[in-house]
Structures are given as C-alpha cells and as structure tokens.
Regions:
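Catalytic beta-strand/loop signature of glycosyltransferases that borders the donor
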Residues: 58, 126-132
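C-lobe/activation-segment region of protein kinase-like
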Residues: 363-425
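Conserved donor NDP-sugar-binding/catalytic core segment of glycosyltransferases
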Residues: 37-68
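Conserved ATP-binding subdomain of kinase catalytic cores across diverse folds
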Residues: 210-308, 338
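Catalytic core of nucleotide-sugar-dependent glycosyltransferases
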Residues: 131, 135-138, 144-172
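Short aromatic/hydrophobic "clamp" motif used to bind/position activated sugar donors
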Residues: 25
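Acidic donor-binding loop at a coil-to-helix junction in glycosyltransferase catalytic cores
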Residues: 107-114
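Single conserved hydrophobic/aromatic residue that forms the stacking wall/gate
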Residues: 1-12
C-alpha cells in the first residue's frame, strides 16, 4: 500500500499502515513525488532476496532547493549516528508488525527510530541506482523544524535502543552525534564498567552491558526497597535483574579496589551452587559501574525462577505435601553445609520451592552473603533461626537435617528451637 500524509501525517500514517492488508508498505509524504517505476523496481529487489528489508530510491530536491540529495551508503555504524534512509522506502508489512510500527513516544525523526528498529539486528538495504524520489523542501519544513527537537530525539533513541548504540558507538548517542564514539571512550576511562556473562547466555551480553543505562526505564518492578528487583523479557526468556544500592563512601572505595561487588559475588556463588546440584536460578551475568574511582551501581542478572512459592508460604497456607516440602528444604540446607557453605541471609523469602511430579524442587536466592568453611552442628542448626514455623515443622526440619548430616535428631531439634527463640526474642526487643 502507498500511504500519503500531511500535517497530522504521523498519526494517520500509523493508522493507515495498521489497517493495510497488503504485503508491502510505501509511505510517501504528500509534498513529495515518486516516479511511476519506483514501486515495481523496489518490489523486484524485495522478492529477489529475503534478506533485503528496505529498498529506497535515489532522491532529488525540488521546491526551495534543487540538486541531488546525496545520502551516504547504509551501514549500522553510520545509522547509529545519522539517518540515511528517507521515510519513502519500500518494506514488508511483516517488518512493521515485528517492531511494533512507528514509535509513538518520539515526536520527530520517527523514521530514523523505525529504521533502527527494523535493521539493528541484521538485514540488507538496497538503494536503487536511478532517481525516483523528488523531495520537496520549503522554508520551515518539518526536516528543518525537527532540528530544535534534537535533545528529545537523542533521549528517546538512547532509551529505546541502548544495546544498539552500545554495540555500534561504545555507549550512548551524544548530542554531538559524530563525536559519540570518542566521547564514550573518554567517559569509559573515568566511568569504567566491569561485567561478565555466562557462556550459555552470550546472546544477552548487550543487555547486561547496558543495564546502567536502561534499568530505570524498562522492565517490571518486582520489589523496591534498599535494593530493587525488576523482571525483563529478553529474547523470549524471563529474567530478573537485582540492582544493588550505591554503598556509603568508604565501601565505594573498598568495592572499587579491594573487594568483589555484591553483584559479582551473586553471579559467582549461583554458579557454584549449581555445580554442587543445589538449586538456584541460572546466573546470566553481572555488571557494575564506577565513577572517578568510586564504586557505583551493580546489577546481577538471572533467569526467573519457576518456583511459585517461598518458605514464607508454608506457615500461612495448607500444603498437602508439607512434610515432603520441609524435608526437601532441610536436605538442601544440609547439602549447603556439607559443602562448607553458610548462607548468612537464610530467611523465609530466600528459599523457593515448587511441587513437581518428580518431587519437590528447592532453590536458594539472594546469594551475595556467604561464608565458606566447615559448618559445625551448632552453626548449621543456628542457620534455621530466621525460618518461622510450628513445633511440628521444626521437628521435621531437624529430623531430615540430622539424617542428612549424620547428627543426633534430638540435639538438632533442641538447637534449632533454641536458635529460633533467641532470634524471635531479639527481634521483639529491636521492634
């Protein structure tokens, strides 16, 4: 379909394209003209090669300006800094649907944003050899007026395509666009990033790398407090990102030079637990950023757990297989301790579980605070102190924990109950 527009054209253009049932789309601004042969020439190129996503003509100015509109050849590196494809270009309707059409948030240069959406993950652009577009220029035309909206355009593009700009420019698109790569190199010296991505999730490297830029604007908030959890859909997979708050000044120095960040420890410890066949959501990666040699924000990324419940649910609702669930949690705790791992934030919200046909699945989260070394009987039983429950629940936990570690179950129960009472008493005094 050929779509013409003027004035409120962006709105009408979106509506017209959404209603079209044709295979190909060609937007043409009402002031401009195309040659009678352009569409047939362009369709030939699209049908000849399925990798071709966009076919555009050579163009000539008419109106207040004359001569050929000499646009540079297409490349992703150049597309990251400037648009070299006019709105008048033929593309498949399926591409428009795939990227969600023209962005409604951006109020200028929507064609540039659209071409980035279509082409950033690959695809060819063909420019026909002959002049087949006649582009009208008037004093005060939209292209000239759009220049005043440059800060807005830059902000929206960075928000929507941070991964693309990171890959092509090494960071954000800057207001002086041609200097973007150099500015980003200089900034990276003073604001270095540290990151790692698990080999199985290398396709998410760009996402992990730009978390300091995109975290506040994307995703769904799961929890917000001292730290923040957000869920993202990346490449069809649900992932959870934990953003750790910026530490106080002394710790900013310590984390920058001497100590692993919480995000990095979470990533490393999750991989360690999974090596020991202890359940934990698959770690994807981490990213941290510093500023002027002071540690800043850090982010840990993992797959979203498929476990629908936490230990906190056990005292609050009936579970038909409650004893099996408690025994599975006790066994998981015992395996942790037998491997010399003591979780120092072993609370009800950090133990997840799911009831499956093959048995109860347990996963441990919030892993940045671990202690490594031999875990004694007393230390192991004290580790249950923050888990609420009834006497019957503690009896099951103690019995299974004792069996798994070869301890006396009566002694374990005694120590677990003592630790729980001490913790409850301390909490009451603090509150």
């Amino acid at each position: 379909d050929l779509v013409r527009s003027r004035g409120l054209g962006d709105v009408y253009k979106r509506q017209a394209i959404s209603l079209s049932h044709r295979e190909y789309i060609l937007p043409v601004d009402a002031d401009n003209r195309i040659s009678p042969t352009f569409i047939s020439h362009a369709v030939v190129e699209l049908e000849r090669d399925p990798d071709v996503k966009v076919v555009c003509p050579r163009a000539e100015f008419i109106g207040d300006r004359s001569g050929e509109w000499k646009l540079p050849p297409f490349s992703l590196k150049l597309l990251a800094r400037k648009n070299m494809i006019d709105t008048c270009a033929l593309y498949r309707k399926t591409e428009w649907e795939r990227v969600g059409g023209y962005c409604e948030e951006i109020i200028a240069r929507e064609d540039w944003e659209f071409w980035i959406s279509v082409l950033k993950d690959g695809g060819k652009v063909v420019r026909l050899p002959q002049i087949e577009l006649y582009y009208r220029v008037r004093a005060g035309s939209k292209r000239i007026v759009d220049r005043s909206l440059k800060p807005h355009v830059t902000k929206v593009l960075n928000k929507r395509h941070a991964e693309f700009f990171e890959r092509e420019l090494g960071g954000k698109l800057r207001s002086v666009r041609s200097w973007s790569r150099w500015i980003n190199r200089i900034e990276r010296f003073f604001r270095p990033r540290c990151m790692a991505v698990a080999p199985d999730y290398s396709n998410m490297s760009d996402f992990v790398k730009v978390l300091p830029v995109i975290f506040e604007d994307r995703g769904t908030v799961i929890y917000k407090g001292r730290n923040e959890l957000r869920e993202f859909d990346i490449a069809g997979q649900k992932v959870v990102v934990k953003s750790f708050q910026i530490p106080h000044l002394l710790n900013r120095i310590i984390y920058n030079f001497f100590r692993e960040s919480k995000a990095r420890r979470s990533f490393r410890y999750a991989a360690m637990l999974r090596q020991f066949n202890i359940g934990s959501p698959a770690p994807i990666g981490f990213c941290s950023v510093s500023s002027w040699f002071l540690f800043g924000k850090s982010y840990f990324v993992s797959l979203r757990s498929e476990c629908p419940y936490t230990y906190r649910d056990l005292p609050q609702r009936p579970f038909e297989e409650q004893e099996k669930i408690l025994r599975a949690i006790a066994r998981t705790t015992a395996v942790l301790h037998e491997h010399g791992i003591l979780h120092k934030d072993y609370s009800a919200g950090n133990i997840l579980f799911a009831e499956k046909p093959e048995g109860v699945s347990v996963e441990i989260i919030d892993l940045n605070r671990m202690r490594f070394g031999k875990v004694s009987l007393e230390e192991g039983c004290k580790n249950f102190e923050r888990l609420p429950g009834t006497d019957e629940m503690f009896a099951v936990l103690a019995d299974e924990y004792a069996k798994s570690r070869g301890f006396d179950k009566k002694k374990c129960l005694q120590l677990i109950e003592k630790a729980h009472k001490s913790s409850s008493s301390f909490s009451s005094k603090v509150s």
